[in-house]
Amino acid sequence: MHHIVRSAAIVAASVLTLSLASGAAMAGSAQEEANRKTVLAFYEKGLNQKDADAALAYVGDRYVQHNPNAADGPDGFRKFIGFLREKFPNSHSEIKRSFVDGDYVILHVHAVREPGSRGNAIVDIFKLENGKVVEHWDVVQPIPEIPANNNTMF
């Protein structure tokens, strides 16, 4: 009898451990999906709709910018969006894919500043804290007229 009780306790502990691990994974996935949705909304409002104030609703109490052509903070973001609105009012960025790793969201983007042009391939990396964007990095690569291969950049 003692052996049966001990075996049942081991099975119960194993099931509880697996349940807790599964719940933690689902919670992480839910938070990661929330982070993805935050960044996608931020990107759409800012880069496509060119509405800096609407985009800044998704930004935390700081915004650290690693792009050397844009300043830190909400004012730097407003200036960048103002530049896009003034110089490239018809620009559009199409997010080809997104990846999430905890508090980091990575976007692979086809950005076209002038309709009809080839545009740029961009990888944007955003860091979130408490569900808000607080940091941004990007790398930009012009799409060549004549590529060395038949693969696309997307």
Regions found by a protein language model. Name each.
Residues 18, 22-154:
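C-terminal and inter-domain tail/linker signature
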